[in-house]
Design a protein with these regions (language model features):
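Extracellular jelly-roll beta-sandwich "head" domains, especially the C-terminal globular C1q domain
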Residues: 1-148
Length: 148
C-alpha cells in the first residue's frame, strides 16, 4: 500500500469553485495587543456558496512585570474589522498568572452559506495587566474552504 499516486491534474480549483481554499492575509508578526481592545488578525473575502471558515489566533506573552495576569481572551468571526462579532466566538475568563514567553492559542470554526460576496474578519481580544502580549502571526490565520 505504500506507493506513490499520480493525480490526473495538478491544478487546484479556481478561487470560489467547489474545493477552493482561501488563506487570509495576516497582520504583522509581533503586533502588540492593547488590553481590552479588539485587534483584527486576518480576513478573507468569499463568494456565493457554502464555506467553512477556520480561524486560529496564537499569541505570546512578550514581557512581564510584577504579578502579570491574563484576565481573559476571546476570538470571533464576523463582518466587522473593528469590533468583536456575535456570529461565532470563543471566549475564556481565566484570571491566570502568566510567564514570559507563554504561548496561548484559540480556534474558532463556522460553516456559512452566503449568497453574495462578503469579507469576514478574525478578531482577537485580550484583557491583561502587568505584561505585554504580541501576535504570533506565522501561526495565526483565517482560512476559508468552499464545500458546496
Amino acid at each position: 500500500m505504500n506507493s506513490n499516486i499520480t493525480l490526473a491534474s495538478t491544478s487546484l480549483p479556481t478561487s470560489g469553485q467547489l474545493g477552493s481554499v482561501i488563506v487570509g492575509s495576516v497582520i504583522t508578526n509581533g503586533t502588540l495587543f492593547t488590553s481590552g481592545t479588539p485587534l483584527s488578525i486576518s480576513n478573507v473575502t468569499i463568494t456565493p456558496g457554502v464555506w467553512i471558515l477556520l480561524g486560529q489566533v496564537v499569541f505570546t506573552i512578550a514581557s512581564v512585570s510584577t504579578s502579570p495576569v491574563l484576565i481573559g481572551h476571546a476570538i470571533s468571526l464576523g463582518q466587522s474589522n473593528t469590533a468583536m462579532a456575535l456570529l461565532c466566538s470563543n471566549e475564556d475568563i481565566v484570571s491566570e498568572t502568566v510567564a514570559l514567553s507563554n504561548v496561548i492559542s484559540k480556534q474558532v470554526t463556522r460553516i456559512l452559506a452566503v449568497n453574495g460576496t462578503y469579507t469576514y474578519n478574525l478578531m482577537a481580544l485580550n484583557t491583561f495587566s502587568n505584561c505585554t502580549i504580541s501576535v504570533n502571526a506565522p501561526a495565526s490565520n483565517l482560512t476559508a474552504l468552499r464545500i458546496a
